[in-house]
């Protein structure tokens, strides 16, 4: 089982000095049995976001929705993707997380989906295949994929977990995307 993720949050105190507001080990959670395990690190409701106060938008480390919950918002999370042979895809999972899917793409890979976001997908550990309608590429630690609202899926063809960092930023839907 994947380990917890350490999250350190900073702030400004009453004297105007920077300090550490919290330093916690966030639990990880699967949104569905056999699905990737996620730790939600932070979410914003819009841009610009407020840095005032000490409110924690994700105190339990769980962000269930893939796109930001608020127009103009953002999400950052760490996701541990198990090898494909251990992954039990639930067709309702993507729909429950507000992802778009199509039957023809699901036939290529059951995790094919798209969201109205710009995603920065960073491979931290392991290897993961990024699948698109036309083509695929292997990502290794340090590789970054800029996913711009396109249909895609993640395929872990290896024997160990692939740890990914995702930053999702709300975006306008693509007009010519079928």
State the predicted function of each range:
Residues 1-58:
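N-terminal leader/capping segments at the start of a protein or of a new domain
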Residues 25, 76-115, 148-151:
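Conserved short histidine dyad/triad with adjacent acidic residue
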Residues 107-140:
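A short beta-strand-loop-beta hairpin characteristic of the jelly-roll/cupin
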């Amino acid at each position: 089982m994947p380990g917890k993720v350490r999250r350190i949050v900073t702030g400004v105190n009453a004297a105007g000095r920077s300090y550490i507001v919290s330093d916690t080990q966030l639990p990880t959670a699967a949104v569905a049995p056999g699905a990737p395990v996620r730790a939600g690190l932070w979410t914003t409701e819009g841009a610009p976001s407020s840095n005032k106060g000490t409110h924690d938008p994700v105190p339990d480390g769980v962000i269930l929705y893939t796109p930001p919950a608020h127009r103009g918002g953002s999400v950052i999370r760490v996701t541990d993707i198990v090898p494909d042979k251990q992954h039990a895809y639930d067709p309702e999972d993507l729909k429950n997380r507000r992802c778009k899917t199509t039957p023809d793409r699901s036939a290529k890979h059951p995790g094919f989906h798209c969201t109205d976001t710009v995603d920065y997908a960073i491979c931290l550990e392991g290897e993961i295949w990024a699948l698109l309608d036309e083509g695929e590429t292997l990502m290794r630690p340090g590789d970054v994929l800029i996913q711009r609202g396109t249909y895609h899926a993640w395929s872990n063809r290896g024997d160990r977990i692939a740890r990914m960092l995702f930053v999702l930023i709300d975006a306008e839907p693509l007009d010519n995307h079928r």
